[in-house]
């Protein structure tokens, strides 16, 4: 039986084993998937041991995505630009391939909700690893523009410059934003601590689509704020979690599993039904 895993610290609350076990059942793939808590200073040793014991592939979550980027022998284009790896695969020749499926997970979730991206004006809040991982897949959808904002403007500016060869992207100061956008994506973890970005809620005017990468049992504080300020619809990041998992599964097995049923199951669990 082929072995897969997710590495993180902490990891016990990870939903990845649940998701990938259902994917395997759905696609009739014979595999096992476990959660491995690597020591904070012991990721490389843990993942090396996993691959030496017939491990075929793994997911990597916080705080090890940058270490996984360094660990991989070979990187996909999207992983190189993301500067982080959330998916490792052992190729037939023993080479370890590093990939990043986060951005594809986001895009697939938005498209599943029939959120149009082509020729749309997108506002991306945050300039950390989560934002960096989704910019290339978003640009590949040919939006009219992506505007990046961040508490530290300089960080947003550096990201915009990095991705400018791939499409229309610019950085702005939060205080300079004074108009509505078609799609607003919050890539920060502020919702988890009940905080909102210091930006004018005019961004939602005219019926914008709001997307918060965080998720919980109810609407996130960011999405509540969006709906109170004229957003047309608001989605959380649970579907992105399932979408990036589906993309990882496809990288490993060459088969794309369906996500809708698993997303429903996860939502039920979250809401305590």
Swiss-Prot record:
GO BP: amino acid biosynthetic process; aromatic amino acid family biosynthetic process; chorismate biosynthetic process; shikimate metabolic process
Positions annotated to bind NADP(+): 77, 126-130, 150-155, 213, 237
Keyword flag NADP: yes
PANTHER family, A to Z: BIFUNCTIONAL 3-DEHYDROQUINATE DEHYDRATASE_SHIKIMATE DEHYDROGENASE, CHLOROPLASTIC, SHIKIMATE DEHYDROGENASE
NCBIfam families to which the protein is assigned, alphabetical: aroE (TIGR00507), PRK00258.1-2 (NF001310)
Biological role: Involved in the biosynthesis of the chorismate, which leads to the biosynthesis of aromatic amino acids. Catalyzes the reversible NADPH linked reduction of 3-dehydroshikimate (DHSA) to yield shikimate (SA).
Name under which the protein is recorded: Shikimate dehydrogenase (NADP(+))
Organism of origin: Aliivibrio fischeri (strain MJ11) (Vibrio fischeri)
